[in-house]
Amino acid sequence: MAAYKDLEQQYGQTMEEHSFLPDPENRRYGSMGLCWRHSSRQGGGFFWTYGQQDLYTIKIHDFFFHEDQLLEFHWPESLSVTWYESISGEEFSPCRRLVPGCVKSFIGGREPYRALIHRHIPIVSIGVEITPAYYRDYLRRQFPEEYQSLLESFQTLDQTEHFPEMVQ
C-alpha cells in the first residue's frame, strides 16, 4: 500500500488537473501499480503506473480526448523512454510530430514538457522512467567497469522508428 501512496503523491496533482482520478481497485494492467481513470466530457481511458522505490517507474497510457488538448508537465529529473503504438500530435520543445510506431526519449528536470494532442486518436504507449538514483548511483555501483552515462545515451536516442529491442 505504501507504493500506491508514493505513486499518488508523485502523480496525483497532475493527473487530477487533467481529470484523471485514482482507481486503485482497477486490475486492468495487473495487480501491482496504480491505475487512474479518465472519464469526463473531455475523453476517457486509463493511465497506469508501477514504481520500484526511487529507481524507476513503468507507465502505460491508454486514453483519448474528444478535443485537441494542450498538455504541460513539469517532470522531475529523470530519463524516460516510451514506445507509442498510437498517438497524434506535436511536441513543442523540441518541435516534432508525435506519430505511432516510434520510440521517444525525454530528459526530465529541465524545461516543462509541452505537447498538443489531437482529438479522437487514442494515446496508447508504454514507457520506463528512470530516476537519478538508478542511472547515476545504482548502475555505477553494480557495473563499475562497464558503466557508461545513460544521460548521454538518452540524448542520442531522441526519436526513432527503429528500435526492435523495445517493441518485440
Predicted regions span which residues?
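Short hydrophobic-aromatic micro-motifs
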Residues: 58-59, 81-83, 125-129
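N-terminal low-complexity or simple alpha-helical regulatory segments
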Residues: 1-80
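Functionally constrained cores in energy, signaling, and assembly domains
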Residues: 56-59, 69, 85, 101-104, ...
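Feature targets compositionally biased, intrinsically disordered low-complexity regions
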Residues: 32, 43-44, 88, 100, ...
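Alpha-helical bundle regulatory/interaction domains
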Residues: 92-168
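Residues in flexible loops and secondary-structure boundaries
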Residues: 58, 66-73, 89, 114, ...
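Glycine- and acidic-residue-biased ligand/ion/polar-headgroup-sensing regions
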Residues: 65, 75-94, 132
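Generic low-polarity alpha-helical segments
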Residues: 9-10, 56, 87-89, 139-140
